[in-house]
């Protein structure tokens, strides 16, 4: 993103360093876990393994090579919460989520909202100082991003992916871009972050999650 752009919102300081999900299909779990930390106002990672275990159980899905539904993940956060990451660390090499031990404490819960009104809801949440999770289709160029780390009108579709919306900026020409937080580690793009245009979201995003602490 150009230094001449007008940064309207930037919530990166509210999060830990970007984590790496590795080969497991848990992007939605990572993004929702980050949002659960944010909504509880803690700058500390929460356990993805714990959340994945409960979400797969709620979904009655034993195929751990597939991703999870939004409804299962947000229900798991609302009903079971999450402990700190150190209580049940993530292992990218696992084929099956770990089973949690009993009496983990503390647990962090969030209630949720899901909407298809993507851009208007993102704007409202950012105005309120809040991050969101967006689910969208990915273009081919997602794997070859270079400076200024922007996605706009892109070709192809390599699958769906969940990320966290953490910022917004306006370019000198008036074009609006949103900052996304990925789950592919700090080596990807700009320390794990990149920018997507409003047009990109309008053409590729199909669900949005907002969450609040209990």
Q: Where on the chain are the PLM-derived regions?
A:
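Acidic/histidine-rich, surface-exposed loop or edge segments in extracytoplasmic proteins
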Residues: 12-13, 54-58
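Predominantly the structural core of cysteine protease catalytic domains
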Residues: 5, 23, 29, 33-37, ...
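Immediate flanking context of iron-sulfur cluster ligation sites
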Residues: 13-22
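Non-catalytic, low-structured ubiquitin/UBL-interacting segments
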Residues: 1-14
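Phosphate-handling active-site elements
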Residues: 15, 37-52, 174
């Amino acid at each position: 993103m150009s230094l001449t752009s007008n940064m309207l919102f930037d919530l990166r300081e509210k999060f830990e360093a970007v984590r790496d999900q590795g080969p497991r299909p848990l992007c939605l779990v990572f993004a929702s876990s980050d949002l659960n930390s944010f909504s509880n106002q803690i700058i500390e990672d929460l356990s993805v393994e714990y959340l994945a275990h409960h979400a797969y159980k709620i979904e009655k899905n034993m195929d751990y090579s597939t991703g999870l539904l939004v409804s299962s993940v947000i229900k798991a956060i609302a009903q079971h919460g999450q402990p700190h990451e150190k209580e049940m660390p993530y292992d990218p090499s696992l084929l099956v989520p770990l089973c949690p031990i009993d009496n983990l404490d503390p647990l962090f819960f969030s209630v949720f909202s899901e909407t298809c009104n993507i851009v208007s809801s993102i704007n409202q949440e950012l105005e309120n100082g809040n991050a969101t999770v967006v689910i969208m289709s990915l273009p081919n160029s997602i794997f070859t991003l270079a400076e200024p780390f922007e996605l706009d009108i892109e070709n192809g579709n390599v699958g769906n992916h969940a990320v966290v919306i953490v910022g917004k900026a306006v370019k000198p020409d008036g074009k609006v871009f949103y900052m996304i937080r990925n789950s592919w580690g700090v080596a990807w793009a700009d320390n794990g972050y990149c920018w997507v245009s409003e047009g990109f979201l309008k053409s590729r995003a199909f669900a949005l999650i907002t969450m609040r602490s209990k």
